[in-house]
Amino acid sequence: MEAPILPSVATAEVQPSSVAELMATHLAEKFPAASRAELAARFADEHIVTLPGFCPPPLLAAVRDEAVDIMARHGTYHDLTFEITDNTPRRMRTVGQPVIRDEGPLVHNFYFAPVLLDFVADVVGEPVHTCPYAGEHYVISRLDANGDTHGWHWDDYTYGIILVLEAPHYTEGGFVQAVPNTHWDKGNPDVYGALLSSQVRSYALEPGDAYVVKTNTTMHRVHPIRGEGRRTIVNMTLASTADLDRPMTHETNDALFGGVRDPRIGS
């Protein structure tokens, strides 16, 4: 039996069909050519760059409402460690791609907006593509309990762009940390070695901000939540041209977010 497709609670004011146009107008005004050149230079140096005010406020409110509703109905809490990333923890609530595809039209249209690919390509300095593995197109995650964290890890595909919907003050944790120019050896992962070999940088973000990461060679994490902070994000995976011809595995994504498996459909 196929899962029903439900309307988004957020589409009353912002229609899914208008997402691409809203983003194109906003990004042209917020990030003109000179600004994008500065972002590209920073990304070339740090392999991560923050994008303050990336999402226009009306769209942010609508996407946040949509994601919060989806999380309330479908979020699954995980408390795991992954040997493949040197036993780092994942303590978080998640919703995977199949549910969002059907019940999150704003998130879906945000990811597939051509302007998103063009913008990220300007920042990273090469063409980018939507992920060939549907399970990594977009996922929603939330940290909202003391100690919740998305621990140190790398990703298979080269790039990620993360849209921040809710964020605690940095004093409550939930900020991003990144270690560029590191290598993920899945057979012998070495988080401490990576921490010793390169500089750790930390980035605080606010709702509506986004950040782009070179995720396959930048070890990164979300600092554990302290107290009652709450962080909700949409993580979107983008592929380099080289990624399209490279064999990939999806161990951590499938364990945390379910990959392409639809949890609404019984076995």
Regions found by a protein language model. Name each.
Residues L51, Y159-I161, T232-V234:
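Hydrophobic residues positioned within well-ordered beta-strands of beta-sheet architectures
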Residues G53-F54, L165-H169, T241-A242:
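Short loop segments at secondary-structure junctions
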Residues D118-A210, N216-T217:
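Catalytic core of non-heme Fe(II) oxygenases with the double-stranded beta-helix
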Residues G174-F175, W184-S267:
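Catalytic core of Fe(II)/2-oxoglutarate
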Residues G53-H74, N87-G135:
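Signature of the catalytic double-stranded beta-helix
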Residues M1-A44, A255-S267:
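Fe(II)/2-oxoglutarate
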Residues R42-I48, P52-P56:
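Short, contiguous, helix-prone interaction/anchoring segments in small proteins
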